[in-house]
């Protein structure tokens, strides 16, 4: 396996000049910015001493407010106050509303179906809102460090797809900030712990944030970070704990309907109770309705644990799958790193310790560890540590492939392949004289295109007319360090080519992310059987087309009995191929092959005779 050097080659033009770069953890609930100063990476505080910036933006007639200033209005002005915008990045409006129809926002759809938040200050999409969260972090960094930034490393969940990653980069570009790299959040945590603790061996990164869950299995060895496997859920996080408790309280208080402000106030109170229960055995939840009615209820740890148990079990199931993908057993995991504020919940730590058989690492603040790792990476990428031997091997979470005849998937880049990566594979034409080829790029683990996610389509035109199977089309998949995919197809004899960069309009739906891997395992046997059937059906179609063309050209070489035998074999194959018996199709192909052997020999003899016609022995 090739190891990928992340440090930029060569020395700086001014080798003793420290270049300013930071790491930004753009989180669902809170965001942080960190930098390396005097060789130590740490998060940067604002003027009030707060390190975390609430990922909340309020748009009013008076302007834009970000952080705690906006958060104060989240209950009383929910229509104009956007929280957890990271959950909306790269997703369609229809997908968002299907997931939660009770969101307290006034939405409209853009031309391509993406969500627009209608506020007093105008319409804003998730990219613009994310840029407004990034702006105070960049300003804080430049003020603290005393200069302009040369670049930033922004962290994203490992399960973010191309659209979500591209949206994150575009948010930074709106500010004129250079993105040195998008870094997976679990990998950033590994960088922080790998350098600070000097760990070597297999480590699990359990990252439970406000809106996403990621599990990564990494092998650390002498500065090399190799990601063995990743998994998780882009729609599961601490916010879901809040929603579970809020739903319980609403039912207990028999509140059949709430206004948008009351609903937001209930979620805020649920979060407060959740956080208090990390230190206390019980907490009193309280909600004051707009009519002045006050509801109160004591919530103890056992009640809260019962509400979130199923959600925590989902994360453990993802851990189990990731270990299986990495071919690692529980006892081979030396340490488990806890990342994200939601890992402070006692039940989460109990279940993680129970699964891995050891207490998880929490020596670095789980809220700040990702930003710290990103800062270390930014310091290397900007050229402050050209001698660094830090190597980072990231992976793609789902296989990438192309559709072939019969609706089959030919995987070009397998799941858990390290990135950046380039893979090439050759394909050919199916019909004589074919001058164009349509390509369908898909993502997923299933054997049939219908069961995978469509990413993009493009067409290669101008292929020189040739016999079926004679053209050689080389298809290259390239995945860059940010997980963005480009696909190029080139016909080798003519050099004609076409390419596409895959930037899907929408992100993966919650259902797709949660079920794609499980479905691939649950349907593995069935999928293989369906693939074998489809392959035989494609081969049957190829044989029938080839024989039909041969009969049209050289049918006069056969007598009536021979022609009738072949025609009968073709009719039998066509009839069998329309059914679902793989073995029967294979036998029918073999029978037709036997029946047409003499015809093939006669065609060969005829071709040789025509080629030698008029030639002398000396010429031969």
Swiss-Prot record:
GO terms for biological process: iron-sulfur cluster assembly. GO terms for molecular function: ATP binding; ATP hydrolysis activity; ATP-dependent protein folding chaperone; unfolded protein binding. Keywords: ATP-binding, Chaperone, Nucleotide-binding. The keyword Nucleotide-binding applies. It holds the Pfam family HSP70. Belongs to the heat shock protein 70 family. Chaperone involved in the maturation of iron-sulfur cluster-containing proteins. Has a low intrinsic ATPase activity which is markedly stimulated by HscB. This is Chaperone protein HscA homolog. It comes from Shewanella loihica (strain ATCC BAA-1088 / PV-4). The lineage of its organism: Bacteria, Pseudomonadati, Pseudomonadota, Gammaproteobacteria, Alteromonadales.
């Amino acid at each position: 396996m090739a190891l990928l050097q992340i440090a930029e080659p060569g020395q700086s033009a001014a080798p003793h000049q420290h270049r300013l770069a930071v790491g930004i953890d753009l989180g669902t609930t809170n965001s942080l910015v960190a930098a390396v100063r005097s060789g130590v990476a740490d998060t940067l505080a604002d003027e009030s001493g707060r390190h975390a910036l609430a990922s909340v933006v309020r748009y009013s007639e008076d302007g834009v407010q970000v952080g705690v200033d906006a958060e104060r209005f989240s209950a009383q002005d929910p229509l104009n106050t956007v929280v957890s915008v990271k959950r909306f990045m790269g997703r369609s409006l229809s997908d968002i509303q299907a997931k939660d129809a009770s969101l307290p926002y006034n939405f409209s759809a853009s031309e391509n179906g993406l969500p627009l938040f209608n506020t007093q200050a105008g319409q804003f999409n998730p990219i613009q809102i994310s840029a407004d969260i990034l702006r105070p972090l960049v300003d804080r960094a430049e003020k603290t460090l005393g200069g302009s930034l040369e670049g930033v490393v922004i962290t994203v969940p490992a399960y973010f797809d191309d659209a979500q990653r591209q949206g994150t980069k575009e948010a930074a570009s709106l500010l004129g900030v250079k993105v040195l790299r998008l870094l997976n959040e679990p990998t950033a945590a590994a960088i922080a712990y790998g350098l600070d603790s000097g760990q070597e061996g297999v480590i699990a990164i359990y990252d439970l944030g406000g809106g996403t869950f990621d599990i990564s299995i990494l092998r650390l060895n002498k500065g090399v970070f190799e990601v063995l496997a990743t998994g998780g859920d882009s729609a599961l996080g601490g916010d879901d704990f809040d929603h579970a408790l809020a739903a319980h309280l609403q039912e207990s208080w028999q509140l059949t309907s709430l206004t948008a402000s009351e609903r937001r106030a209930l979620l805020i109170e649920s979060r407060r109770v959740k956080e208090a229960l990390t230190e206390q055995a019980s907490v009193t939840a309280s909600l004051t309705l707009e009519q002045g009615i006050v509801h109160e209820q004591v919530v103890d740890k056992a009640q809260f644990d019962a509400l979130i148990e199923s959600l925590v079990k989902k994360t453990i199931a993802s851990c189990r799958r990731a270990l299986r993908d990495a071919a690692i057993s529980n006892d081979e995991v030396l340490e488990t790193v806890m990342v994200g504020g939601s890992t402070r919940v006692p039940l989460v730590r109990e279940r993680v310790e129970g699964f891995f058989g050891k207490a998880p690492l929490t020596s670095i603040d789980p809220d700040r560890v990702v930003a710290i790792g990103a800062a270390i990476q930014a310091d290397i990428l900007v050229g402050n540590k050209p001698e660094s031997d830090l190597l980072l091997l990231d992976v793609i979470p789902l296989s990438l492939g192309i559709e072939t005849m019969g609706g089959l998937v030919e995987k070009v880049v397998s799941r858990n392949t390290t990135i950046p990566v380039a893979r090439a594979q050759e394909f050919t034409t199916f019909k004589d004289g074919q001058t164009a080829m349509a390509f369908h790029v898909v993502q997923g683990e299933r054997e049939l295109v219908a069961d995978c996610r469509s990413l993009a389509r493009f067409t290669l035109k101008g292929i020189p007319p040739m016999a079926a199977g004679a053209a050689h089309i080389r298809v290259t998949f390239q995945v860059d360090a940010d997980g963005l995919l480009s696909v190029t197809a080139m016909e080798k004899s003519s050099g004609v080519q076409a390419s596409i960069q895959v930037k899907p309009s929408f992100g993966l739906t919650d259902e797709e992310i949660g079920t794609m891997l499980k479905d691939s395992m649950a349907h593995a046997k069935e999928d293989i059987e369906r693939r074998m059937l489809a392959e035989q059906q494609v081969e049957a179609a190829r044989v029938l087309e080839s024989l039909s063309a041969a009969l049209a050209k050289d049918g006069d070489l056969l007598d009536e009995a021979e022609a009738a035998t072949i025609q009968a074999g073709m009719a039998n194959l066509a009839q069998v191929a329309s059914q679902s018996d793989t073995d029967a199709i294979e036998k029918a192909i073999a029978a037709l092959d036997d029946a047409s052997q003499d015809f093939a020999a006669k065609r060969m003899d005829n071709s040789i005779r025509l080629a030698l016609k008029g030639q002398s022995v000396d010429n031969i």
